Amino acid sequence: VYQHEPSTDKNNRFRSDHTLFPIRKNISLEQNRLHVDYHFSDQMKQIFTTEINLAMPSCDGMGGRYVYQGKIPGGFGQLLELNHLTEIILDDDTLGGSVVLRTSSPVTLRAYPHYSVSQSESGFEKIMQAVTLQVECPTPAQGLNITLEINAR
């Protein structure tokens, strides 16, 4: 559980002091980039995982795809796992651009569709609402920076 710390209008700071290994989290917005910085306590030698649920307009349609090292390993509606990743592009035709995920240290990325269920006149429907991105890595001593950058075509 994160507690909010005094912040400025340019960033928000949080801390998790109620755990064995405190984590500090700083969120800032700079032009077209969202930065999230994690700072770990020195004694934390664990695996750190965080989850990003990102609504992409194309969702599981034909216009949404991952681009990794210049290749397309799959679409937003597919399961994806990549190791030693520091950058991946989420390219979306409906968005008319892309979201670039960058990390300061190599991570394991697990991506999968996030579905909801709704009831309509024809019964229950499973609808993809977002892309879930799980970022996992050993806690780096210098901390971890995750950046999401939105780019128009």
Question: Predicted segment positions?
Answer:
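Beta-strand-rich recognition/accessory modules
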Residues: 1-43, 84-153
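Residue-level detector of solvent-exposed, low-hydrophobicity positions
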Residues: 9, 28-30, 59-63, 73-75
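Surface-exposed beta-strand/loop patches in extracellular or lumenal glycoproteins
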Residues: 46-56
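Surface-exposed, gly/pro-biased binding rims or lids
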Residues: 70-91
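Short aromatic-acidic-glycine turn motif
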Residues: 54-68
